[in-house]
């Protein structure tokens, strides 16, 4: 049975006003236990206001990057998400369980086109998939349809645009916004 390990937070950054990305330091002694595949998640644990609180968050990094990152969007009234976004700091520690879950497809040697329809924070496991499949499958193509409320609420927008440039012609992105008029990054508005 998997157990929790204490991991130090290497960095915590804001992606949007209500979404933080936690980057964990990974000791060499734990790197094998924390090996992951695209689409998996980490279960985090902290004592918050005297209560043992646990939540699972999709990994948004890729093993190609040799990083362990999760994004946590603040939910109104959310105990753990508020703790991460308002209290947690670089250098703090969290209890973390090794990766689990099977949301995704294995790496292929054949030419494939992947298509993902994502809304808001649902981008987190898909970002890991985009990075991994495009890096490990030279003939792969990826089409991302990404729905958000506003431009400022687009999680990982800068990173996604960097990936589009890095994998020019292999990564297509279609943004859709529900609370703003059509703008240059968006071809149409969803009502």
Which ranges hold each PLM region?
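Ferredoxin-reductase
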Residues: 2-92, 148-150, 178
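FNR/FR-type flavoprotein reductase catalytic core
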Residues: 82-191
């Amino acid at each position: 049975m998997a157990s929790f390990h204490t991991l130090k937070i290497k960095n915590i950054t804001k992606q949007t006003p209500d979404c933080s990305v936690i980057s964990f330091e990974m000791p060499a002694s734990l790197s094998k236990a924390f090996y992951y595949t695209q689409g998996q998640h980490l279960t985090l644990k902290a004592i918050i206001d005297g209560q043992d609180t646990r939540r699972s968050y999709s990994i948004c990094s890729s093993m190609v990057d040799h990083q362990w990152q999760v994004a946590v969007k603040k939910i109104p009234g959310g105990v753990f998400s508020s703790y991460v976004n308002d209290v947690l700091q670089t250098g703090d520690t969290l209890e973390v369980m090794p990766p689990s879950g099977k949301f995704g497809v294995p790496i292929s040697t054949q030419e494939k086109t992947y298509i993902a329809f994502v809304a808001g924070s649902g981008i987190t496991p898909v970002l890991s998939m985009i990075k991994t499949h495009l890096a490990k499958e030279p003939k792969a193509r990826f089409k991302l349809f990404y729905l958000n409320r506003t431009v400022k609420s687009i999680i990982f927008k800068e990173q996604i645009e960097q990936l589009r440039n890095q994998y020019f012609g292999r990564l297509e992105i279609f943004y859709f916004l529900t609370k703003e008029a059509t703008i240059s990054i968006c071809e149409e508005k969803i009502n």
